[in-house]
């Protein structure tokens, strides 16, 4: 049995078309959705991510604004700029690209973003509201994974789900969303004693640790759904995930590739969150 591929590019295309239609409707009413992206320093990976986010905005009828600062920018100046963006009615979403330079407290910066413009879903108000199932925004990567489950009719209610990774960006919110959908959730991490004992029981495995081959074929229950959130490089410098794709695809029922799986969905859900912020602002105007 070879697993069915969950194609993030195809699903992204569909969702971006819907986002573009919603953006056009808002723009016609004088409320073009606007996203501000703030980049501090010259991290090459961050520059690529920011470029992709700006392009996605431009391609789908969103207004986008990019602030690029040297890594010498002070924390106070960054906080002052966020305050300006919070008060700018043309901006509905604010995204500060992580990581930030060491002298800037990223927690303080993320908390400075107005919760109603926190399209990454990282503000403590949104992270906390996720516990009650009522956040203004859900973090983009796990939100995108949930859309993948939905698009492929993968049953979550009563399913045993294992999330490998406990980051605030993916692991924890992913576990909360699966729990909300009725799954029985286990979170595994670097201190987990016998990872395979957990994953072999799982109907769904989400790997999100940034470590190559953390999940191999012998660790997967036949027919399970495997979601690979990892972004790594193999020995040849080629992009790969956390999952041994070649082996696991022969055992799993569904699997996401890297690249072309979860990655495109993250930016797509950023657009969806931004359009929702703009629609709320327009309704309140």
UniProtKB/Swiss-Prot annotation:
Signal peptide (from-to): none
Protein keywords: Amino-acid biosynthesis, Histidine biosynthesis, Hydrolase, Methionine biosynthesis, Multifunctional enzyme, NADP, One-carbon metabolism, Oxidoreductase, Purine biosynthesis
Amino acids binding NADP(+): 165-167, 190
Family annotation (Pfam families): THF_DHG_CYH, THF_DHG_CYH_C
Cited SUPFAM superfamilies: Aminoacid dehydrogenase-like, N-terminal domain, NAD(P)-binding Rossmann-fold domains
Gene3D superfamilies: Leucine Dehydrogenase, chain A, domain 1, NAD(P)-binding Rossmann-like Domain
Enzyme Commission identifier(s): 1.5.1.5, 3.5.4.9
GO molecular function: methenyltetrahydrofolate cyclohydrolase activity; methylenetetrahydrofolate dehydrogenase (NADP+) activity
UniProt-listed InterPro entries: Aminoacid_DH-like_N_sf (IPR046346), NAD(P)-bd_dom_sf (IPR036291), THF_DH/CycHdrlase (IPR000672), THF_DH/CycHdrlase_cat_dom (IPR020630), THF_DH/CycHdrlase_CS (IPR020867), THF_DH/CycHdrlase_NAD-bd_dom (IPR020631)
Functional pathway: One-carbon metabolism; tetrahydrofolate interconversion
GO CC terms: cytosol
Domain of life: Bacteria
PROSITE patterns to which the protein is assigned, alphabetical: THF_DHG_CYH_1, THF_DHG_CYH_2
Reaction catalyzed: (6R)-5,10-methylene-5,6,7,8-tetrahydrofolate + NADP(+) = (6R)-5,10-methenyltetrahydrofolate + NADPH; (6R)-5,10-methenyltetrahydrofolate + H2O = (6R)-10-formyltetrahydrofolate + H(+)
HAMAP family to which the protein is assigned, alphabetical: THF_DHG_CYH (MF_01576)
Family membership: Belongs to the tetrahydrofolate dehydrogenase/cyclohydrolase family.
Function (record text): Catalyzes the oxidation of 5,10-methylenetetrahydrofolate to 5,10-methenyltetrahydrofolate and then the hydrolysis of 5,10-methenyltetrahydrofolate to 10-formyltetrahydrofolate.
NCBIfam families tied to this protein: PRK10792.1, PRK14186.1, PRK14189.1
Protein name: Bifunctional protein FolD
Biological source species: Burkholderia ambifaria (strain ATCC BAA-244 / DSM 16087 / CCUG 44356 / LMG 19182 / AMMD)
Lineage: Bacteria, Pseudomonadati, Pseudomonadota, Betaproteobacteria, Burkholderiales
């Amino acid at each position: 049995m070879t697993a069915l591929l969950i194609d993030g590019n195809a699903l992204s295309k569909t969702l971006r078309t819907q986002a573009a239609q919603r953006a056009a409707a808002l723009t016609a009413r004088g409320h073009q959705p606007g996203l501000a992206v703030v980049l501090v320093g010259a991290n090459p990976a961050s520059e690529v991510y920011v470029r992709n986010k700006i392009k996605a905005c431009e391609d789908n009828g969103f207004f986008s604004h990019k602030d690029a600062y040297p890594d010498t920018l002070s924390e106070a100046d960054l906080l002052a700029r966020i305050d300006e963006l919070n008060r700018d009615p043309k901006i509905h979403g604010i995204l500060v690209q992580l990581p930030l330079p060491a002298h800037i407290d990223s927690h303080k910066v993320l908390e400075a973003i107005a919760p109603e413009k926190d399209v990454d879903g990282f503000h403590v108000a949104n992270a906390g509201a996720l516990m009650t199932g009522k956040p203004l925004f859900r973090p983009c990567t796990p939100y995108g994974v949930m859309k993948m489950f939905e698009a492929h009719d993968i049953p979550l209610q009563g399913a045993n789900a294992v999330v490998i990774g406990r980051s605030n960006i993916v692991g924890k919110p992913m576990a909360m969303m699966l729990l909300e959908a009725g799954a029985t959730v286990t979170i595994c991490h670097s201190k987990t004693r016998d990872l395979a004992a957990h994953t072999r029981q799982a109907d769904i495995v989400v790997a999100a640790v940034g470590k190559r081959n953390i999940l191999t074929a012998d660790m997967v229950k036949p027919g399970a759904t495997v979601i690979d959130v990892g972004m790594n490089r193999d020995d040849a410098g080629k992009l790969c995930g956390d999952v041994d794709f070649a082996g696991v695809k022969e055992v799993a029922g569904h699997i996401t590739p890297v690249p072309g799986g979860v990655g495109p969905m993250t930016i797509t859900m950023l657009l969806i969150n931004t359009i929702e912020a703009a629609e709320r602002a327009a309704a309140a105007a």
